[in-house]
Amino acid sequence: AKKLLAEAGYPNGFETELWSAYNYSTAQKVSEFLQQQLAQVGIKAKIQALEAGQRVEKVESQQDPATAPIRLYYVGWSSSTGEADWALRPLLASESAPPRMFNTAYYKNAKVDAAIKGAQLTTDSAEKAKLYKEAQDEIWKDAPWAFLVTERLLSVNNRKLSGVYVMPDASFTFEEADLK
């Protein structure tokens, strides 16, 4: 990494800011870990947890990637709908760049866009899964982001309680809850 930095014109590293969309425990730990890792190759990163208003101003309102102030940004996402579309389209479809949605990498890939659009238009579950896999494979190859962490959801309860489930978006469902 130091060699690549030197080749890019930064033989002594550089200073930057690492923005976090959150200030909760996991985000703080991940940001500090990134800060430590970057320091090992000469990049001094100052961590700044953005308040909601700052996030909108500095990240989510920036239409032009050339003038957007974003450089390093830690953000998390879960598909609140449980659908693959909401896991990919708002973050990685070309049409989803700020201020419309959350493609803060300003990522553009025609194959990804076509696969996501095709998946939206079909009702065939197998075809939909195939298209989302194609999109994910392209995204993985391009690496528009560094995918860092997948949080594990943990839920414990009394043996007398059943029917309470943790959903993919970290919410709970109580519709089938039963206390014996």
Predicted regions and their residues:
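Thiotemplate assembly-line natural product biosynthesis machinery
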Residues: 1-2, 33
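Short helix-initiation/N-cap motifs at beta->coil->alpha
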Residues: 22-23, 47-60
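Immediate post-signal peptide segment of exported/extracytoplasmic ligand-binding proteins
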Residues: 2-17
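Detector for C-terminal structural segments
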Residues: 22, 26-36, 40, 60-180
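Short, well-ordered beta-strand elements
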Residues: 13-22, 45-46, 71-72
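FAD-dependent oxidoreductase catalytic-site/capping-region signature
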Residues: 38, 44-47
